[in-house]
Amino acid sequence: MQHRDVGKPTLSYSGRLIAQMTEIDEALKPVLPRELTTVSDEVRAVPAPPLPVLAEPFALRPADPDADAEMISEWMNRPHLVEAWEYPWPPQRWRRHLKAQIDGEYSRPLIGSFKGADVVYVELYRAAKDSIAPRYAADPHDIGIHAAIADLRFVNRGFAPLLLPRVVASVFEIDPRCRRIMFDPDHRNTGARRVCEFAGCTFLGEHDMANRRMALYALPRTPADAPPTGDLQSSPVGESISSS
């Protein structure tokens, strides 16, 4: 005579219930939490950022929600990107995040490669449609860049200063109405801040956001395109470090 193990069905049901609750919780979260829901008609009419064209050995392509979600999720769960991005999401949430960007006009998710190997996740977004817009004199055609380099070895070898100028040059060429490229690293991310300053960005101060304090930078097409700095809330990273 076989005895039923009454514990197993209970555990199985409990596991399914937890999984379902997790899915519900994920579904209720904003898919694009930084996108502004109220913008002017002028800002709303501006299309999504263009796809930059890079010369070999670099390349950028649109991210595929179905094909790339697993890879991006694995990247974003690596310690250095958990710290920098705080997006250690499971693949299903990344799939929703990618699809929402592709379906809208706010941002575009991209995969960057070097010598044919995928190495970086990039988001180009319209800064005037983003939560950073109220923090400076945003122009409807400004474009922001977020980049997540997957391999820490590439980070340590200065990959960002090699990639960034190529992306910026292509964006300015393709979108002649874009006057500025925006960056908003965490105020503690000295590596990203040094890249911004190396590129010649204008520092627009540190600003408290909903979940973090960010350092805002603008890379203008020409010096005349730089937004006004106003009363800065902090010094550039180099000055902060040298004075401490």
UniProtKB/Swiss-Prot annotation:
Active-site residues (renumbered): 184
Record field: compositional bias (Polar residues): 231-244
Residues involved in substrate binding: 146
Coiled coil regions in record: none
Enzyme class label: transferase
Gene3D superfamilies: 3.40.630.30
SMART domains registered for this protein in UniProt: AlcB
A Pfam family: Acetyltransf_8
Pathway info: Siderophore biosynthesis; mycobactin biosynthesis
Single GO MF descriptor: N-acyltransferase activity
Keyword tags: Acyltransferase, Transferase
Region (Disordered): 224-244
Record text on subunit structure and interactions: Monomer.
UniProt xrefs under PANTHER family: LYSINE N-ACYLTRANSFERASE C17G9.06C-RELATED
Function summary: Acyltransferase required for the direct transfer of medium- to long-chain fatty acyl moieties from a carrier protein (MbtL) on to the epsilon-amino group of lysine residue in the mycobactin core.
Protein name: Lysine N-acyltransferase MbtK
Originating organism: Mycobacterium sp. (strain MCS)
Lineage: Bacteria, Bacillati, Actinomycetota, Actinomycetes, Mycobacteriales
